[in-house]
């Protein structure tokens, strides 16, 4: 049969619809906040991506960290949390209002002396997502990511913005991996 030939050539890439739906129906819905949960149908589902957008100081980081605290609870699987501190602005103020956050268990990725490129941040995030099932990946913020070319070129150099293309390719590359890993990716703008 065609299916057997495809499986022989590509591996177990064909499954029945009932298998897929059964697997997906077991995905947990994790609450974010009462107001957002109403709009989201109860919260964020494992294996999804979400973008938090809003004005500066509107609570995007705090909301993401509160969601991380919920994910760390036993009720929601004691999920590992990785926080990409792209802006380098994670402060105790962000953490103080977050009930139940286990800060000692969060892995914070951020530049030290030298700035890190968008490619470095995205590669690190990809590695964590691929190797850490059920993780929560917070990228704060995607608008602060700087492609390597822009980091090394002169400020006056003429070039086309490459961040949208980088993000598009990164999302495409991880599109099937995030659901398989039951990861949740939160990107703050």
Annotate each predicted stretch with a short phrase.
Residues 84-85, 109-111, 186-189:
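Conserved beta-strand segments of the P-loop GTPase G domain that flank and frequently precede/overlap
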Residues 114-189:
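P-loop NTPase motor core
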């Amino acid at each position: 049969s065609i299916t057997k030939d495809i499986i022989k050539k590509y591996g177990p890439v064909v499954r029945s619809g009932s298998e897929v739906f059964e697997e997906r129906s077991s995905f947990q819905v994790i609450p974010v906040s009462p107001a957002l949960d109403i709009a989201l149908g109860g919260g964020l589902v494992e294996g999804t991506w979400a973008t938090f957008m809003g004005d500066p100081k509107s609570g995007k980081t705090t909301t993401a960290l509160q969601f991380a605290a919920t994910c760390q609870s036993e009720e929601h699987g004691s999920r590992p949390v990785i926080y990409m501190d792209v802006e380098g602005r994670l402060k105790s103020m962000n953490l103080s209002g977050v009930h139940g956050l286990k800060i000692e268990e969060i892995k914070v990725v951020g530049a030290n002396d030298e700035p890190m490129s968008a490619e470095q941040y995205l590669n690190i995030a990809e590695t964590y997502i691929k190797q850490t099932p059920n993780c929560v990946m917070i990228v704060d913020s995607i608008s602060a990511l700087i492609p390597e070319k822009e980091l090394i070129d002169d400020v006056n150099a003429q070039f086309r913005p490459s961040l949208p293309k980088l993000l598009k390719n990164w999302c495409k590359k991880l599109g099937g991996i995030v659901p398989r890993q039951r990861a949740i990716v939160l990107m703050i703008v």
